[in-house]
Structure formats: C-alpha cells, structure tokens
C-alpha cells in the first residue's frame, strides 16, 4: 500500500506517470517497511529485508537480466538485431507484422514454458521493427509481452502450470483442457484486432538485403529456447555466437565487443535494483504477516460456487501483486484454494486453471513484474508506457470473468 501511495502520489505530484522512477518509490516504501517492522532491532530488520532480496528465485532472475542485457546490446552493435528486423520486414507485409510477432511470442513461450525467455528473444526485434516502420515502440513491445503469457499459461513445462496442478492434485493435461477454453478465444480475438490495427499501417520501408550470417545469434537463441535449453545457457550460447559473428562478419574488434557487453549489463542496473527492492519488501511483508492477513480477510464470506471461484481468482491476483511472482503467488494461495474448492464442490481442474490464469493476468498489470521490467529495460522505455497496450491480458481476464459468471466449460463445473 505504501509503495502504491508513493508511486501514484509522486506521479500525480509531477503530473506524469511515465517519469517517476520505480526505484525511488521502492526505496521510500522499503525504508518505511524496515522502520515500521516491530519487535526487532534495526540490524535484524535489515537482515529480514536482505533475506527477501536474496531469495534464490530472485537471484536467478538477476543472472538472467545480466546475460540478457549483455546479449541484447552485443547483438545490436554487431548488426544481428538489424539483420533480423530486415528479414522480418522482407517476409511479412506491414499489415502482418503485429499478428506475426504475437503468434511468434505465443509459439515460443508455449515451447519454452517461460514468458521471460520469450521477452528476451523477441523484444529487441519488436523494437527494431517499430523503429523501421515508424510504429509505436510500447505497442510492439506489448505485443511480445502479451503473447509471451499465452504460452506461459498453457505450456506443460511452465513452472506456473506445475505449481497450480500440484497444489490442486490434478493432471497438467486436464488443466490444459480447461485453459484452452479461456486462452484460445482470447488469443483469437486479439489476433483479429492486431490484423485490423496492422492493416492501417501504411509504410514503404526499403528493406536491405538480408545478411544471413548476422541473423545466426538470434536464430540460435530462438531455436535453443524452443528446444527447451536452460535460459541462462541459451543466453550464454547467444553471446558467444554474437561474439563470433562480430569478429568474423562485422567490422568490430574483441575489445569493443567486451565494451558493448558491459554497456548491456549496465543498462540492466535499474531493473536489478527494482527487483531486489521489491523482493526485500516481500520479505518484510511476509515476516509481518501481511500475506496471511490478506488471505484471511479475503477468504471470509464466500457464498456459492461463483463466489468461491471469484475469491480464489482475486486471492491469487492480489498475492501476485504483492509478490510480483506468479509462481510464488500460486504456491502461497494453493493450499487455501484447495480447501475452498473442496468445501464448495469446485472441480480441481478449473481451480488450477483459475490459479494459473489469474496470476498471469495480474503479473501483466504491475509495472514491477519481471516480464514488463525486462521488456522496458531492453526497449529503453517506461514500464507504464507498455501497460495500456497489453490487450491479450485484458481479453484473458474478461474470459475468466465470463467463465465464472456463465460457468463454462460445463464439463469442469
């Protein structure tokens, strides 16, 4: 709450939601959190905050940010990004660029099982395409972010799918069968919207001849990600490939490329700071019983199946907004969701689907979520500028609401 008050308050004060640094709002709210944590000396309070920031999942994400920054900057400087953009522009007419990017993000995230890996692979390409045709960079980046959550929500190897199905005691296949009733209609509607928006794009960009050698780093990253290789290993291989391409085909020396990698790592500094501060705040919130308090208060007064499903959806969404991690949110709420599900006779497969889907929707609309932060950092834009263009999560949230109101799919009620 303090963070939201700080961020919204400062934004209103300066009259611009796009210029207020997230890091400042997190620093102020973190100081408040440490100061108001009771019954502990200051040193112990700082240790609680630091343990939250040093969570293994968070540090793993930091390593991804570092390697992603190095790869993105190196690929850009050696010409790999420009070559990939030229290939895309030569293959797809202007009206098909948005739908093509969205489908690519959906497919890659479905194969990889992670939205972050998809964002890392496609955001520089989306940014380059927008720049070439004079399109909105936040809009094109949002297409990638939205599509990345399609697969994250459906994939059998996604950590959110695994967490949701295990917590509810159902199979991943059954949860998938429920999810497609929500995700596929939403994706088709948004795909149609992108065709309409793309059809209005009028551009006569003269694409240069495609330099296939320069495309290899991005092609390698996408193929290895689809194969299912660990994202850190994929990025390392991508960096090596970009380095080799730079030495062999680009007019670049090794020392310059090391400098480019350093620039890329430096560009991720703000993202890493925000991630650590947000995780430290979560540590304080959990220590002070904030998550338990939210769950206890929100789970009271449930009436009927629709009320139970609505409460499960809201619970996981609110906890996700506090933790900025959809997997942790599902794990935190999963046990209580199963109790509610059994008490009100809900189908465990539908409950697992609601947990996964609503956590993904909530993750899209917080400016400090890993996916939006990563995309904004790679594109050099504000996180807030991306949020209004996230059409797919809006549509997915609407499908969840309709599925609760009209109780579909009937087989899973």
Per-region residue spans from a language model:
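Core transmembrane alpha-helical segments of multi-pass membrane transporters/permeases
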Residues: 23, 27, 35, 46-79, ...
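Alpha-helical transmembrane segments of multi-pass membrane proteins
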Residues: 64, 95-108, 134-151, 307-320, ...
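Hydrophobic mid-bilayer segments of alpha-helices in multi-pass membrane transport proteins
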Residues: 1-7, 18-38, 61-67, 122, ...
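Membrane-interfacial loop-to-helix junctions in multi-pass transporters
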Residues: 55-61, 86-104, 130-140, 208-216, ...
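Juxtamembrane and boundary regions of transmembrane helices in multi-pass small-molecule transporters
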Residues: 13, 17, 146-149, 153-208, ...
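Re-entrant/interfacial helical elements at transmembrane boundaries that shape
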Residues: 117-128, 145, 156-170, 293-294, ...
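Hydrophobic alpha-helical transmembrane segments of multi-pass integral membrane proteins
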Residues: 62-71, 93-125, 298-338, 355
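Interfacial loop-to-helix junctions that mark the boundaries of transmembrane helices
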Residues: 12-25, 52-56, 88-93, 177, ...
């Amino acid at each position: 709450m303090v963070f939201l008050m700080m961020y919204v308050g400062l934004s209103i004060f300066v009259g611009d939601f796009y210029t207020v640094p997230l890091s400042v709002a997190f620093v102020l709210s973190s100081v408040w959190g440490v100061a108001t944590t009771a019954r502990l000396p200051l040193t112990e309070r700082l240790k609680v905050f630091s343990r939250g920031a040093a969570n293994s999942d968070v540090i793993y994400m930091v390593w991804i940010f570092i390697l992603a920054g190095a790869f993105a900057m190196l690929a850009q400087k050696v010409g790999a990004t420009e070559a990939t953009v030229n290939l895309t522009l030569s293959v797809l007419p202007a009206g098909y660029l948005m739908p093509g990017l969205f489908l690519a993000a959906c497919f890659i995230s479905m194969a990889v099982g992670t939205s972050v890996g998809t964002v890392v692979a496609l955001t520089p390409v989306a940014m380059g395409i927008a720049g070439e045709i004079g399109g909105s960079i936040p809009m094109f980046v949002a297409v990638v972010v939205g599509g990345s959550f399609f697969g994250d929500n459906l994939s059998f190897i996604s950590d959110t799918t695994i967490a949701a199905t295990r917590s509810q005691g159902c199979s991943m296949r059954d949860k998938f069968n429920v999810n497609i009733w929500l995700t596929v209609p939403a994706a088709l509607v948004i795909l149609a919207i992108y065709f309409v928006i793309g059809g209005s794009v009028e551009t006569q960009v003269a694409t240069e001849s495609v330099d296939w050698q320069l495309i290899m780093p991005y092609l390698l990253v996408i193929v290895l990600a689809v194969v299912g290789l660990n994202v850190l290993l994929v990025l390392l291989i991508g960096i090596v490939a970009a380095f080799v391409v730079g030495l062999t085909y680009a007019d670049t020396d090794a020392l310059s490329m090391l400098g480019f990698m350093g620039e890329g790592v430096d560009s991720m500094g703000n993202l890493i700071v925000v991630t650590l501060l947000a995780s430290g705040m979560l540590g304080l919130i959990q220590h002070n019983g904030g998550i338990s308090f939210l769950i206890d208060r929100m789970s009271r007064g449930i009436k009927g199946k629709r009320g139970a499903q609505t409460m499960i959806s809201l619970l996981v969404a609110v906890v996700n907004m506090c933790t900025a991690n959809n997997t942790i949110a599902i794990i935190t709420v999963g046990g209580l969701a199963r109790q509610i599900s059994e008490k009100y006779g809900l189908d465990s497969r539908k409950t697992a689907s609601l947990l996964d889907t609503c956590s993904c929707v909530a993750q899209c609309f917080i400016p400090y979520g890993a996916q939006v932060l990563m995309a904004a950092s790679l594109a050099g834009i504000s996180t807030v500028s991306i949020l209004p263009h996230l059409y797919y999560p809006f549509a997915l949230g609407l499908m969840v609401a309709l599925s609760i109101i009209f109780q579909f799919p009937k087989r899973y009620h």
